[in-house]
Amino acid sequence: MIKTNDFMEIMKGRRSIRNYDPAVKISKEEMTEILEEATTAPSSVNAQPWRFLVIDSPEGKEKLAPLASFNQTQVTTSSAVIAVFADMNNADYLEEIYSKAVELGYMPQEVKDRQIAALTAHFEKLPAQVNRETILIDGGLVSMQLMLTARAHGYDTNPIGGYDKENIAETFGLDKERYVPVMLLSIGKAADEGYASYRLPIDTIAEWK
């Protein structure tokens, strides 16, 4: 359920929260809603390569704990930790995505046919490393949107990059060659307010030509 639609409050009130109220659980229905809203994020050629592993059971968290040894508080107290992956087989879903766009009236059939033909040729010769770099960017976009969506629902998050990326896919039965780790996101009800942080001024980080 949406708690606020005030975008500035959502964005500027976001904090990286490490300690959560362990009594607060997020239902599968609400988590599904949060993920659906987050996946309105943009992606290259609308391939939507993001994949989510929602780790919310005691057994799942027990598996995750040794892979995130420096982030134990987030793992143990959060409602869930979402492992965000990027799918190297992203091109496999283009037919489904573009066909559904035609069915829903978002795209004419002739545009879909032309796009699929061009994209099929593109992906056949696309170097794996270039595809990997692209889907990681897409994974970052959806992760940021997920954090903001969580805030709209009244929850807080913490993006985690310090974990065992080499072994997380296989630990949870996923193909490590196919699923590229993007980040972990803890989510739940903050037990602490978190800290405000300084941002560099625009004069330092931007220039006009």
From Swiss-Prot:
It holds the Pfam family Nitroreductase. Keywords: Flavoprotein, FMN, NAD, NADP, Oxidoreductase. Gene3D superfamilies: NADH Oxidase. FMN binds at residues 14-16, 72-74, 161-162, 199. Its EC number is 1.-.-.-. The keyword Cell membrane does not apply. One of its GO terms (molecular function) is oxidoreductase activity. SUPFAM superfamilies: FMN-dependent nitroreductase-like. Its cofactor is FMN. Belongs to the nitroreductase family. This is Putative NAD(P)H nitroreductase YdgI. The lineage of its organism: Bacteria, Bacillati, Bacillota, Bacilli, Bacillales.
